[in-house]
Every structure is written in C-alpha cells, then in structure tokens.
C-alpha cells in the first residue's frame, strides 16, 4: 500500500511542477508575442 503522506507529497510536487511549467510557457509566449508585434 502507498502511504497517504507519501502520496500527498508526490501529488503536490507534480501539481507544483506542472503549474511552474505552465507559467513559464505562458510568460515565454507573451514575451514572443510582444516581440513579434
């Protein structure tokens, strides 16, 4: 069985990682948009 605490830590890290990648990609997209215009 997977310990609830370990599962919570893993899920939390995954969510934070995905959120960080999304924010980084969004900022880069905005930057390229401004440069393109």
Curated annotation (Swiss-Prot):
- Places the protein is found: Cellular thylakoid membrane
Q: Which UniProt keywords apply?
A: Electron transport, Membrane, Photosynthesis, Thylakoid, Transmembrane, Transmembrane helix, Transport
Provide the primary localization.
Answer: membrane
Whether Signal counts among this entry's keywords is no
**Which GO MF terms does the UniProt record name?**
electron transporter, transferring electrons within cytochrome b6/f complex of photosystem II activity
Q: Which InterPro entries match?
A: Cyt_6/f_cplx_su5, Cyt_6/f_cplx_su5_sf
* BP GO terms, sorted: cytochrome complex assembly; photosynthesis
Q: Is Transport among the key words of this record?
A: yes
Transmembrane regions listed in the UniProt entry: 5-25
Membrane topology term reads:
Single-pass membrane protein
Gene Ontology CC terms: cytochrome b6f complex; plasma membrane-derived thylakoid membrane
Briefly state the protein's biological role. Component of the cytochrome b6-f complex, which mediates electron transfer between photosystem II (PSII) and photosystem I (PSI), cyclic electron flow around PSI, and state transitions. PetG is required for either the stability or assembly of the cytochrome b6-f complex.
Q: Which family does it belong to?
A: Belongs to the PetG family.
- Subunit structure, interactors included: The 4 large subunits of the cytochrome b6-f complex are cytochrome b6, subunit IV (17 kDa polypeptide, PetD), cytochrome f and the Rieske protein, while the 4 small subunits are PetG, PetL, PetM and PetN. The complex functions as a dimer.
Protein name per its UniProtKB record? Cytochrome b6-f complex subunit 5
Q: Which species is this record about?
A: Synechococcus sp. (strain JA-2-3B'a(2-13))
Output the lineage of the source organism: Bacteria, Bacillati, Cyanobacteriota, Cyanophyceae, Synechococcales
